[in-house]
Amino acid sequence: MFDWTKSCSYDEHQKKRFHTTARSRLKKLAAELDLTPGSYELRSNKAGIAVSGEVTLHHDSAYIQVGQFGMSSGHGILIRTCKGRKDYTGGANHFVALTMLDDIPALAAAVRAITGVGRDAPHSAVRRAA
C-alpha cells in the first residue's frame, strides 16, 4: 500500500510515485462515479522541488485535487463543486484524508455527498422539487 504521508519534498522518486499512484486512483474514482468519458480531465502539476504538487480530476461539475497540502491535519484531498472545466475556484472547499485514496468506494461516496456528481448521487431538494 502506498504511504501517502511520506513527504515528496526534495524526493523526486517519491514525488513520481505520488503522482503516478494518485492519478491511477483518480482514474478509478472516475470509473466508480461512472463519469462519462470526455466529461472530465486528469491533470498533474509537479510544481517545485519543495512541494508535492497536485493531481486533479476536473469534471464539468466537480473539482477533486490531491496533494500533500494539509499534512498536519491529515487532509490532502480537496473536493468542491464547479461550473465547468474553466472554473478553478468553484464552490466551498471540503477536505478529506489522503488515505481515502485507498478506499475508492468511500471516496466516491464523499464526492457524491459534497458535489452531487456520480452514479447514485443524492438529489438535492431543488432537483426533487422539479
Model-inferred region functions:
Residues M1-D3, V117-A130:
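Short intrinsically disordered terminal tails
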Residues M1-H58, A125:
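Negatively charged, low-complexity tracts enriched in Asp/Glu with abundant Ser/Thr
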Residues T20, S24, L42-A50, L78-A92, ...:
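Charge-dense, helix-prone N-terminal extensions
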Residues R23, K27-A30, P105-A108, R112-T115:
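Residue-level detector of alpha-helical secondary structure
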Residues H58-A113:
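Intrinsically disordered, low-complexity regulatory segments enriched in Ser/Thr/Pro
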